[in-house]
């Protein structure tokens, strides 16, 4: 019987995203004034400017969807609730490590680092694997209890024991079904 879990994680807007959005709308205001001053008959440009600003603003709203089917991990990046891009697709047997994030983790040792969490600081677990396309890959994530359980169950027993040991050493509680779904 197949086992499946999924989680939608909305990325919080940080200071960087807020500045980008503010600059976009400030640019629209300045360009609108210039259009009104120098090209009054071409006011359709104002509508196009506003639409373009809205479209650019929406690109700052990012969500990650974790899907785990029989231990295989897929992560999609959803931009502005309209564009979906698969950023990770790895079979359970190809996962090298599934461990809690600790100070010992060195992202610079990887060719590709993907932060599929609110931020690097809020990521609770990571997955590593080798990709033919991208090389050694590190994925930082925040799985809820169901996604964690499916990833955990998809790993061989030796990797499950390593995860349990790493969680004990790091003082990280293993997520359980009683945990809040997030």
Regions found by a protein language model. Give the residues of each.
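Transmembrane-cytosolic junction motif
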Residues: 47-72
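Transmembrane helix interruption/hinge and helix-loop junction motifs
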Residues: 33-44
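A membrane-cytosol interface segment of integral membrane proteins
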Residues: 116-169
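N-terminal membrane-targeting/pre-transmembrane regions
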Residues: 1-28
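Cytosolic, membrane-proximal regulatory domains of ion/volume homeostasis and mechanosensation machinery
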Residues: 101-123
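Structured surface patches comprising rigid loops and adjacent beta-strands/short helices at the edges
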Residues: 87-106
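Eukaryotic intrinsically disordered, low-complexity regulatory linkers and tails enriched in Ser/Thr/Pro
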Residues: 1-4, 26-27, 45, 166-182
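Membrane-cytosol interface motif
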Residues: 69-87
């Amino acid at each position: 019987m197949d086992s499946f879990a999924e989680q939608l994680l909305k990325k919080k807007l940080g200071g960087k995203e807020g500045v980008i959005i503010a600059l976009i709308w400030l640019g629209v205001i300045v360009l609108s004034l210039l259009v009104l001053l120098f090209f009054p008959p071409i006011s359709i440009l104002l509508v196009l400017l506003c639409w373009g600003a809205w479209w650019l603003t929406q690109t700052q709203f990012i969500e990650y969807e974790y899907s785990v089917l029989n231990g295989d991990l897929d992560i999609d990046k959803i931009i502005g609730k309209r564009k979906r891009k698969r950023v990770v697709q790895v079979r359970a047997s190809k996962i090298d490590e599934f461990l809690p994030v600790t100070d010992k983790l060195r992202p610079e040792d990887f060719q590709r680092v993907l932060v599929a969490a609110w931020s690097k600081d809020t990521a609770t677990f990571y997955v590593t694997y080798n990709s033919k396309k991208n090389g050694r890959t590190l994925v930082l994530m925040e799985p809820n209890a169901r996604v964690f359980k499916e990833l955990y169950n998809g790993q061989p027993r030796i990797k499950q024991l390593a995860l349990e040991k790493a969680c004990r050493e790091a003082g990280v509680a293993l997520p359980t079904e009683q945990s809040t779904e997030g």
